[in-house]
A protein has these predicted regions:
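Short acidic-glycine-tyrosine-enriched beta hairpin
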Residues: 77-94
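Short beta-strand His + acidic residue motifs that chelate non-heme Fe in jelly-roll/DSBH
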Residues: 53-56, 73-74, 91, 96-103
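A short hydrophobic beta-strand segment most commonly corresponding to one strand
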Residues: 63, 90, 104-123
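A short, N-terminal "cap"/entry segment at the start of jelly-roll beta-barrel domains
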Residues: 1-39, 121-143
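Short, conserved beta-strand element in jelly-roll/cupin
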Residues: 44-48, 57-73, 112-115
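Conserved short histidine dyad/triad with adjacent acidic residue
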Residues: 27-30, 43-58, 93
Length: 143
């Protein structure tokens, strides 16, 4: 058994999400990064209003569990979906997608995924444009 104690500094401190992966302010609290042979990664991800991921995919898929606020998610070519606390989202392996907060509300989710044999958890693509985020006219501002 291994216990990792919570601390204000160190390996489980909150970090700001990198600009290469996110638009807007996103903060990440690591929950689990289990040592091999486990492949599990878990992060509590905090999106400020309007913040979102870039397009990306996961070699082994991803599960999201919304804990606070109201969010948006979309798979490439699909409609923008509104997600709320208690909602669970499963993203298929290699499915391009993005997720984030609505323009007027924050959103927090628990992100669960695994690393592949090369220790890769995600493949990052281009940023989601404002037109893509706004659904080319879809009104998500009241969500």
């Amino acid at each position: 058994m291994q216990i990792t104690r919570s601390s204000a500094e160190g390996t489980n401190a909150t970090t700001k999400g990198p600009a290469e992966w996110f638009t807007g302010d996103v903060y990440i609290d690591p929950v689990a990064a289990s040592p091999a042979p486990s492949r599990v990664l878990a992060n509590l991800v905090h999106f400020t209003p309007g913040a979102r991921t870039a397009w990306h995919s996961h070699p082994l898929g991803q599960s999201l569990f919304v804990t606070e606020g109201i969010g948006l998610c979309q798979r490439r070519g699909g409609p923008i979906e509104v997600i709320r606390p208690g909602d669970r989202v499963y993203i298929e392996p290699h499915e391009e997608h993005w997720h984030g907060a609505t323009p007027g509300r924050l959103m927090v989710h628990l992100a669960l995924n695994e690393v592949d044999d090369e220790h890769v958890a995600a493949h990052w693509g281009e940023h989601v444009t404002d037109d893509e985020y706004n659904g080319a006219g879809t009104d998500t501002s009241q969500e």
